[in-house]
């Protein structure tokens, strides 16, 4: 899976680079899975409007130099989204062949349920921050019925929910850039001193 994350690297520059490299190599499009995201708008926060979703996909396709995405994720929850608008956008994208599968990123079980109320496509993925320092979704299940801090369920049982609903959990930042290189440890040590 190549997750281009659309707009985060200098307004799509990463997708443009990938598109150029893809065009200059012997990759066959059907041999790779291309995934992108939409929803985060710098300066505005989030936008899951039909118009924004459709525009984001068009821009990603243009930059990636392809005619379809295998997976489109709604990036971070838009607490004020209209699930009906998301459903309309997904129907148009699927119907036109521009997106084959859909998912979410960083959504809670209730946010997913709200989407499922209107969206008829399966949401196949929930991309979550998951790594050694961010493993609470597993730890809280291991410490059930205990008084430890790890027993506090801060994610609304998202791991169990995804497993019950056959949603793949994709880990984002699994190596937690900077954490294991010492940068964060040095910062913490400097704060303590």
What are these regions (language model features)?
Residues 77, 81-193:
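Beta/alpha (TIM)-barrel catalytic core signal, keyed to glycine-rich beta->alpha loops juxtaposed to Asp/Glu
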Residues 28-32, 67-71, 97-101, 122-125:
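Short acidic capping loops at alpha-helix termini that bridge into adjacent secondary structure
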Residues 4, 36, 169-171:
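Hydrophobic residues in well-ordered beta-strands that form the structural core
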Residues 38-54, 75, 79-81, 147:
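Active-site mouth loops of central-metabolism enzymes
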Residues 61-82:
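Active-site groove signature of glycoside hydrolases
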Residues 1-32, 95, 176-178:
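N-terminal binding-site loop/beta-alpha segment at the start of enzyme catalytic domains
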Residues 46-65, 85-88, 109-114, 154:
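Short, acidic/polar
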Residues 30-42, 127-132:
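A short, structured active-site edge motif that brings together acidic residues
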């Amino acid at each position: 899976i190549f997750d281009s994350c659309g707009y985060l690297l200098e307004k799509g520059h990463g997708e443009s680079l990938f598109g150029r490299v893809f065009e200059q190599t012997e990759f066959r499009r059907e041999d790779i899975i291309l995934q992108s995201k939409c929803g985060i708008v710098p300066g505005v926060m989030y936008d899951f409007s039909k118009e924004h979703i459709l525009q984001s996909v068009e821009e990603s396709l243009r930059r990636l130099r392809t005619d379809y995405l295998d997976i489109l994720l709604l990036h971070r929850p838009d607490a004020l989204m209209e699930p009906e608008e998301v459903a309309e956008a997904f129907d148009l994208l699927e119907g036109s062949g521009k997106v084959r599968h859909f998912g979410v990123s960083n959504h809670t079980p209730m946010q997913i349920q709200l989407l499922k109320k209107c969206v008829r496509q399966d949401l196949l993925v929930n991309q979550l921050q998951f790594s050694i320092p961010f493993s609470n979704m597993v730890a809280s299940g291991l410490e059930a019925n205990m008084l430890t801090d790890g027993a506090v369920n801060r994610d609304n049982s998202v791991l169990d929910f995804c497993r019950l609903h056959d949603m793949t959990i994709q880990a984002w930042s699994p190596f937690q850039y900077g954490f294991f290189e010492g940068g964060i440890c040095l910062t913490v040590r400097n704060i303590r001193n």
